[in-house]
Amino acid sequence: MRNKILIVGLLFGMGVAIALDQRQRFEAPAMRWLYPGFLERLPSVTGLRLSKAGDGVDLVFDNGTWVVAQRFNYPVNDKPLFQLLDQLDRARLIEKKTALSKHHGALGLLEDASDSGSVLMFQGDTLLKPVVIGQQASTRPGTFVRFQSDDQVWLIDQALEVSAAAADWLAPSLLTINDQMIESIELSNPGEVKYRVVRDERDNWVLAATPEGRTLRYDTALTPLATTVGQLRLLDIALHDPARWVGAGSAVYQLTSSHRLTLRTAAAQEGYWLRIVVDSDEVDPSDASDATLQVKAVEPKRSPALDQVLGPSREALTRFDFRIAKRNFDDLNRSLEHFLKPQDGEEIDG
């Protein structure tokens, strides 16, 4: 079904352009298509493989969903996939270049070399021949390509940018949430004072308990705690490892929908990690073990409101740990002192 939706989207999105292209065939000399009839052949495609210098990724159409095979069949980021398919459908061979293989390196069209091009292969339709994607042209929009079985180089009229790294194709959304959906926030990090943030009568974020003699740096100092959660972006995934979460910090977001999200964060040698748990109000996330939270996450309350908030599926939340950017990690681990105005004699920490 999703494959059909993707095709319908391509048809509607390119309808005007296709009509213009067809009219131009009668007004200008015809140019060859990179893949004639590509859109009509798309329903038979069951997967794409992109490889470069020993690295490679398989995007597979599995049970109605495009997934990344090298990442445990995690959903694909539709945006770059849609763009790539759109460009391949539009691509024309506008200029014939060299047919001498000795010049392939200069155009980024070698295979199995450190400066090689990306090889794109289709699964499910043998008429869509593998193509090597090289450098982009410097004088006009376009990309040098050649079919894998042919030394002849062509310039096409599309600027193709593709990646053979599996992590680059993962659906990046983690949480779709805004300030007004949050009722309160509680941060608890190792070695730091636990604190809770709530709204005051003017709807500003304030500390539930301000340390005696201290004030916030400025009135809206706590606002980033509410906005950060909607700006989280997934960089990669790994199978859930309980050992990764020993001593991890947590940020608990109580939502106006009565759901509660516990965002656990951990720093490791390979990067910064996030674990998202949907738990019930009976469990105190700061006291519960990861095993307890994981059980609660298997069957959280089902609600359209919660489904709109969560990027990953419920199963993915239980199965995976999510790698995030350092800035996201830092934002979810701000100490209480970070938000307070320095005391007399203290230097201001920007």
Region annotations inferred by a language model:
Residues M1-G350:
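A short-motif feature that recognizes glycine-rich, charge-decorated loops
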